[in-house]
Amino acid sequence: MSFWRALLRETGLKGATRTRSADTTVPARAEQPVEKPAERPTGVSVPSPAPASGAPTEPLALTGAREEAARTTSGVAHAPAPTAGMRAASLERTLRSLVERLGTEHPDTITARNNLATKYAQMGRRQAAVQQFELTLAEAVAVFGEEHPRTEIIRENLAWAYEDAGRPADAAGQWEMLLRERERQFGSADEDTVEARMRLAVCYRRSGRLDAAVVHYERAIEDVASTERREELRLGLSAAQSMSGRYEDAIGQLRMVLAGRRRRLGKGHLDTLTVHHRLGRAYTQAGRSDEAVEVLRDAYRVALNSSGDPEVRRLTLRLRRDLAGAYNAAGRYREANALL
């Protein structure tokens, strides 16, 4: 076990568990005072940074019987829960106070700025979140160094903030650094290393670096331990291959995922039908019209028999439209018109 992995466990820092597709985002490692960015729900409220002076930085809330007694004796109605804007304002006040008392390069200030950036991200204030995470990372590097676990957490938060703000190229730069460090410390097959490689592949694909994306998807597929995550990676790989015109390779990946999901979930499951639909579209893109018709028709029939789920019903409509298009491409106009 590496030094930093041991320290992560001793200090309570750990990789947060979250299931996501290869096209979506994953949480940063968690520690008690350092929060995750937007849309990485952990179920933990924003913590206040530990005060250097020993005095609380925010008023403590009454709980349980004490809170009830306070309401009874005062006769005042219980105040409504604070809004996101109120929480952000409180975090802004906390940060200003810490900057004035301790300066910007103090651990408490760094924690407070990270928490404020997190709240901005949760509120959808993406640009403000990015700006605060950038400042937090610069301060963390100056105080803790590049390789400190807390710096890594903040760097991952910034990478996620860049992704949320539609800046995949900037996010890729952060994931590259995280991947190098995790590979050095933990090895290529470690769960967090694979996660960083997957996110790097996603960002490369979204920023148009398709060959690099394919390389990292393929490596992540080799290293990942989970069957479900391997399927997600294959879907991401197939998307990168399709975008680069490698339709036959994309079809091969989709066929493997479809076979696996049929075994695990059944052919009528939404996740299975979604891949079935993608396979039919891949055949259409490859100019294999007859096979596209066969695959899309099969998926459409299965969806019709599994349409109790509203999501399946919506997918059924898309399948019907794409099947009609495949019939047209194959010169089968009468069958296409019957679906329109």
Residues covered by each model-derived region:
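Intrinsic-disorder-linked linear interaction elements in eukaryotic regulatory proteins
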Residues: 1-340
